[in-house]
């Protein structure tokens, strides 16, 4: 969704930098396919070691390519280092917009990243700042039960998984065999802290909203603030392979 959105809102030439492991490869492939299909150009794709303390050589290659955007998919702990070096090398002042997959700005780790994360745009299925009453209650519950922890995508995924199991077994009358359970949850829908959720009756994949988010400071803390919604999204990687 990040690729679609950015292609429609000004970005024409984007370099990708991803961690060199399977999820990074998938993210790179999906972004390139979607962005180029929308008319954009990806002149350079870089893969960095999964545990990489120095992004300077890669960022220099990014600068040399003169893109108007940099898409990153790097685990949150490493992402903070990359973003700091992005700012230290002045790329934030060079006209290169930093964008990425949502888990690089993990809600629970976001404040540790500091101001280098400000302005980063991401696309993801959850933000702790989602304004629904259900999410506000969820965020407060997680905070109270976990010594101040902020709810994140791991937490909401666990919540939805438990909800699905509970409702599935309730619908089967206690039967837990595979056929009964799968039959019960096909097409199921519910209101999650992340927003509306459902199970595709054909593929049994999750269908949910994807939110465009921007890191902003609110009341002294950093949050992924939603500014646009793409509703009822199916698995984007599978869709890109069709």
Describe the function of each predicted region.
Residues 1-242:
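Extracytosolic ligand-binding ectodomains
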């Amino acid at each position: 969704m990040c690729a679609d959105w950015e292609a429609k809102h000004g970005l024409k030439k984007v370099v990708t930098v991803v961690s060199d492991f399977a999820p990074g490869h998938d993210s790179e492939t999906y972004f390139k396919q979607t962005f180029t299909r929308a008319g954009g150009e990806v002149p350079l794709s870089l893969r960095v070691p999964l545990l990489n303390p120095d992004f300077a050589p890669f960022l220099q290659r990014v600068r040399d390519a003169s893109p108007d955007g940099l898409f990153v998919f790097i685990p949150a702990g490493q992402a903070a280092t990359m973003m700091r070096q992005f700012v230290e090398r002045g790329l934030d002042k060079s006209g290169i917009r930093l964008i990425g997959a949502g888990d690089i700005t993990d809600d629970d780790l976001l404040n540790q990243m500091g101001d280098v994360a400000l302005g980063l745009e991401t696309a993801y299925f959850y933000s702790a700042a989602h304004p629904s009453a259900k999410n506000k209650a969820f965020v407060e519950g997680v905070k109270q039960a976990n010594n101040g922890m902020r709810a994140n995508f791991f937490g909401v995924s666990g919540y939805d998984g438990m909800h699905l199991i509970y409702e599935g077994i309730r619908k089967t009358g206690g039967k837990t065999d595979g056929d009964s359970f799968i039959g019960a949850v096909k097409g199921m829908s519910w209101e999650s802290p992340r927003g509306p959720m459902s199970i595709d009756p054909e593929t049994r994949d999750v269908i949910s909203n994807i939110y465009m988010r921007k890191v902003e400071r609110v009341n002294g803390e950093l949050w992924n603030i939603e500014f646009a919604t793409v509703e009822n999204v199916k698995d984007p990687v599978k869709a890109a392979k069709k």
